[in-house]
Design a protein with these regions (language model features):
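Bacterial N-terminal signal peptides that target proteins for export
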Residues: 1-9
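Bacterial signal peptide processing site
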Residues: 24-27
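A glycine-rich, hydrophobic loop/mini-helix early in the fold
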Residues: 64-96, 100
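An amphipathic alpha-helical core segment
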Residues: 147, 151-192
Length: 226
């Protein structure tokens, strides 16, 4: 065998080895992403199932933890006035409104999960537990707010939440002071906005909790995509 033949054969073996490694890496990357997506979709399903049930929504600590400061201030003021029952009614109205956001939230989140890339996976490996949810939040939070806020606003208007709160506060304009608005539309929009924020952030809290519970599975599946 002459020198040229040996050189060509060596190059062929090297090329074959590189191609094989690339195929293995590609296949492993696909498997790792599939595992990641499956876990995130599981977290989304878990969260939206909670949103679908008023009592589950009310009882969930991760959703309660997402309550914006403005609504905390409203509730604190009502409680100081001895209106605990009204605080509970407000929470129930928000929980009922949440059930109407499930159908618009699901496709937004599902599409975002299905569009995750190997670059996203590499960032998750570097960032550790919770990073996948953070990426999902970056991709979808604005879109979710835009999609669910009108539904929340319509339901809270239907329930007459603002007028109920204003009547309870006897025209003192405390609600306007707390929410930074004066008109009825501003007050309704304020409560709807903050309720929508609670829903979006509460949903991501649930997804992140699910991700963290499955952190070792995710990391093991993505280690080959570093």
């Amino acid at each position: 065998m002459n020198r040229n033949t040996i050189l060509v054969a060596t190059m062929a073996v090297a090329t074959l080895g590189t191609t094989t490694q690339s195929c293995v890496a590609l296949a492993t990357s696909s498997v790792g992403l599939a595992v990641l997506k499956q876990i995130l979709l599981g977290g989304i399903t878990k969260g939206l199932n909670i949103f679908s049930d008023k009592n589950s929504f009310l009882a969930n600590e991760l959703i309660e933890a997402a309550l914006p400061q403005q609504l905390k201030d409203v509730n604190s003021t009502l409680q100081k006035l001895g209106l605990n029952s009204l605080v509970q009614k407000e929470k129930e109205y928000i929980a009922q409104a949440a059930t109407f956001t499930v159908d618009v939230s699901r496709p937004i989140l599902t599409n975002a999960v299905n569009s995750l890339t190997a670059e996203d996976a590499a960032r998750i490996v570097q960032g550790g537990s919770g990073t996948a949810t953070q990426i999902l939040k970056e991709k979808t939070s604005e879109q979710l707010m835009a999609a669910i806020a009108p539904k929340v606003d319509a339901k809270l208007n239907e329930f007459g939440l603002v007028s109920t709160l204003n009547n309870a506060l006897a025209g003192s304009n405390l609600l306007g002071t707390l929410l930074g608005g004066q008109s009825s539309n501003a007050l309704t929009g304020g409560i709807s906005k903050f309720a929508s924020q609670q829903m979006v952030n509460g949903l991501f809290n649930i997804i992140q909790s699910h991700e963290q519970q499955n952190a070792s599975t995710i990391m093991n599946s993505l280690n080959s995509i570093k």
